[in-house]
């Protein structure tokens, strides 16, 4: 997929603002040379405060103002953080995991196989799409947000797992032999008596369940994409902000998602890349994670989230924002988008700083963003859709990752697949050797 210009912008939340300043914000965004915002993905309860009662006031304010200031918009489906009324009416929606039953409050606490969740998620996606489909400024759609299976072990998930195993192993004796289930009397001779997967001591069977959980994510994306495709125009794209294994920052391959398979229903891969800054800014995370993103579909990608200031010690030194933006673009990104425009005034991410601080006034970061944005207005058409010719490829896959993590290199060490993966990537990065990461399975 090709673009005419580099997309440069921010995530924006009118619904989080302490007071009305949307005109001021969008003028500042435009004046900074930014040309895109992402909206809507986090606030299902704002769009549907009660079951069947919808209020898209903030959505239309953002879309109307974006059109006025000639900003492109990416709309996210708001299904990763469920409203309280949904959890109260259908408590089974809250996931059952290896650690027990989830409580309401934090995000991504639901069972993505639960039929009541899927029913209501489809309703809010369709209602949202009906609201945005006629806006020319909407250029694309982000499916959900940093999706994973959330370790769902619900009755629905486990029933699906048994059906998955029956399809993979029509002969139950073959299944028992393949996984060595005579050990400790773990043998299963009746599919209807299949034990709760959370109790297994068989690492191979546990690895198979993790593979199945990754398939749940792939199926979830395909399901959402089919809904969105009923409304999207031919000139609009579908993407997702894939994330990475987290070591206080984006580190390596995401163990819980087969990103190669999950992205097949999308037009372009997207990702979220967060990394240390100041004296710890090395470029390694931007390169390693960007290479993973580029390998998902073997093409350019979108950085749907990266930090402007971000975590407490990450306030960038002067010039680092520009260095970071150019690094993303040089690695094949067609978009660089900050999470987020304004620092949030309450809740858990209050001090994950945006472009603007809590006083919402122009600052050093805003001025540096303005330099980047206005440079990209001049030269972005020459930098977009950059291709890299790689002499080396690294085959990286979830099956190897899961296997190595299940059967550890050293029980006294925290080293895992991604640790070894990064040793290799970082060494080659320091040697200025460009890599492509690819799946062991050929692409369609």
Regions found by a protein language model. Give the residues of each.
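N-terminal carbohydrate-binding accessory modules
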Residues: 1-36, 382
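Polysaccharide-binding and catalytic clefts of secreted carbohydrate-active enzymes
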Residues: 98-268, 272-279, 283-285
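Short, acidic/polar
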Residues: 17-29, 250-261, 318-325
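Aromatic-lined substrate-binding rim segments of carbohydrate-active enzymes
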Residues: 24-30, 39-96, 225-231
């Amino acid at each position: 997929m090709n673009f005419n210009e580099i997309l440069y912008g921010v995530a924006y939340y009118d619904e989080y603002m302490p007071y009305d300043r949307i005109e001021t914000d969008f003028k500042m965004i435009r004046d900074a040379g930014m040309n895109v915002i992402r909206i809507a993905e986090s606030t299902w309860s704002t769009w549907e405060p009660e079951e069947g009662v919808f209020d898209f006031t903030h959505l239309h304010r953002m879309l109307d103002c974006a059109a006025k200031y000639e900003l492109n918009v990416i709309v996210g489906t708001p299904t990763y953080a469920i409203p309280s009324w949904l959890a109260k009416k259908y408590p089974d929606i809250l996931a059952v995991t290896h650690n027990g039953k989830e409580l309401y409050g934090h995000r991504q606490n639901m069972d993505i196989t639960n039929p009541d969740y899927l029913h209501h998620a489809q309703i809010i996606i369709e209602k949202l799409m009906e609201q945005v489909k006629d806006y020319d400024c909407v250029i694309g759609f982000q499916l959900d947000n940093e999706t994973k299976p959330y370790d769902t072990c619900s009755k629905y998930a486990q029933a699906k797992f048994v059906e998955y195993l029956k399809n993979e192993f029509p002969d139950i004796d073959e299944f028992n032999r393949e996984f060595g289930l005579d050990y400790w009397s773990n043998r299963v001779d009746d599919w209807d008596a299949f034990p709760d997967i959370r109790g297994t001591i068989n690492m191979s069977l546990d690895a198979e369940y993790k593979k199945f959980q990754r398939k749940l994510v792939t199926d979830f994306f395909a399901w959402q994409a089919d809904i969105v495709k009923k409304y999207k125009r031919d000139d609009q794209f579908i993407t997702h902000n894939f994330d990475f294994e987290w070591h206080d920052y984006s580190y390596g391959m995401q163990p819980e998602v087969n990103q190669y398979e999950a992205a097949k229903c999308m037009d372009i891969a997207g990702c979220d890349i967060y990394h240390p800054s100041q004296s710890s800014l090395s470029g390694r995370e931007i390169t390693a994670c960007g290479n993973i993103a580029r390998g998902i579909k073997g093409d350019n990608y979108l950085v749907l989230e990266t930090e402007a200031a971000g975590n407490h010690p990450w306030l960038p030194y002067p010039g680092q924002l520009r260095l970071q933006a150019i690094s993303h673009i040089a690695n094949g990104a067609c978009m660089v988008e900050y999470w987020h425009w304004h620092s949030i005034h309450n809740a858990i991410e209050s001090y994950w700083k945006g472009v603007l601080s809590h006083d919402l006034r122009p600052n050093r970061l805003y001025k540096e963003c303005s330099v980047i944005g206005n440079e990209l207005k001049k030269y972005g058409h020459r930098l977009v859709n950059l291709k890299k010719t790689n002499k080396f490829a690294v085959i990286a896959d979830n099956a190897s990752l899961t296997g190595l993590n299940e059967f550890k290199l050293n029980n006294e060490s925290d080293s895992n697949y991604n640790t070894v993966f990064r040793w290799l990537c970082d060494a080659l990065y320091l040697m200025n050797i460009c890599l492509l990461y690819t799946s062991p399975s050929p692409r369609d």
